[in-house]
Amino acid sequence: MVSEMTPTRRVMAAVLGGRVDYVPPANPLAQTTTELMQICNASWPKAHFDSKMMADLAAAPYEICGIEAARPQFDISLEAEVLGCKLDWNKPDRPPVTGPAYTDPADITWPDNLEEAGRIPVVLGAIEELRKRYDGMLPVIPVLTSPFTVAGHIAGVENLVRWTKTDPEKAHAFIEAATDFVIAYGKLQTAYGAHILFPADPSASGDLISGETYKEFVLPAHKRMAKEISCPLILHICGDTSKLLPYIKQSGIDCFSFDAVPVWYCRQVMGNEMSILGSLDVIDLMPNGTPEQVYNRTRECILQGADIVGTACDVSFGTSLENLRAYVRACKETPIPKYDDVEDIIRQIGVGIGRNMKENVLGGMQK
């Protein structure tokens, strides 16, 4: 029996494959719901430019709902903006990139003093504020937009994906330049006090690229991040990553946060080589489901082998505080299961349901 832990110790242990007193509700996806923003008097776009407001909003899920993580930086366009992309600030929440900034990877540049570049000082200030406010008790987990996605922003996603087939040398050059920048920014976040980094690489989704493309173009970048950034990493990739999982677990990254893959299947593929974080639906369950449904789904994630429970993507604005609290309560009230393999998981969640999942869901993935 593990004695009561602080959120930071609990989340660190879960990410690194250690013992915990319960599966932590440590969601590193953005949780900027309308209610939370109203409670902490935050607004767009000011929360993207004000370190204090960013820290307040990042801490609100913990203060109001008990979610055991603070995630400063709410968008994944900051890195591309520093590299020269224009953003659309007319959107009501997170600014998207309006278009590519480069056609030739040799032209890519960024400011010499990264600490003062773009909105990076805002994020670094929020990290410092959160570390000071909680004295290390609450894990600070800023997002770090990852190389394939950054390369897609600055070159154009369609261009980058096409070049992986038609001009692989050019694709590699864009990804390598993006990797250099991402690692430099990640080291800064760590130096300013981040406990864990949350590399998000949505453009590396299995919905956009094949497993072989991931292996050739993305995996080397993820390996570099794991080797060159000193703090633990939780990698997130959206969509169906079933064909990518065997390669992702070779990355050296500590934990994988996933979207459209069954928890038990991710657990089976990763085994004990990588912690997993998953995966509450944000399209229907979190904004439209009842607290009871959220509670039950959270329990299912734990029973199927999740080391940490979080959402499949950023939480929608309309998600209620009651649903966020139900997710936290389920984590705290569900005993940690002990399984030897996926067959034990199947027996626990029901032979009929489990066998059907294994034959139909897994069979569909492998086609």
Curated annotation (Swiss-Prot):
Record EC number: 2.1.1.251
EC class name: transferase
Molecular function terms, GO-annotated: metal ion binding; methylthiol:coenzyme M methyltransferase activity; uroporphyrinogen decarboxylase activity
Residues binding Zn(2+): 236, 238, 313
Key words, A-Z: Metal-binding, Methanogenesis, Methyltransferase, Transferase, Zinc
Cofactor: Zn(2+)
Lineage: superkingdom: Archaea
Record field: catalytic activity: methanethiol + coenzyme M = methyl-coenzyme M + hydrogen sulfide + H(+)
Example of a GO biological process term: methanogenesis
UniProt-listed InterPro entries: Methanogen_methyltrans, Mtase_MtaA_CmuA, UROD/MetE-like_sf, Uroporphyrinogen_deCOase
A family per Pfam: URO-D
Cofactor: how and how many bound: Binds 1 zinc ion per subunit.
Subunit field text: Homodimer.
PANTHER family: METHYLCOBAMIDE:COM METHYLTRANSFERASE MTBA (PTHR47099:SF1)
Function of the molecule: Methyltransferase involved in methanogenesis from methylated-thiols. Catalyzes two successive steps: mediates the transfer of a methyl group from the substrate to the cobalt cofactor of a methylated-thiol-specific corrinoid protein (MtsB), and the subsequent transfer of the methyl group from the corrinoid protein to coenzyme M.
Family (UniProt): Belongs to the uroporphyrinogen decarboxylase family.
Descriptive protein name: Methylated-thiol--coenzyme M methyltransferase
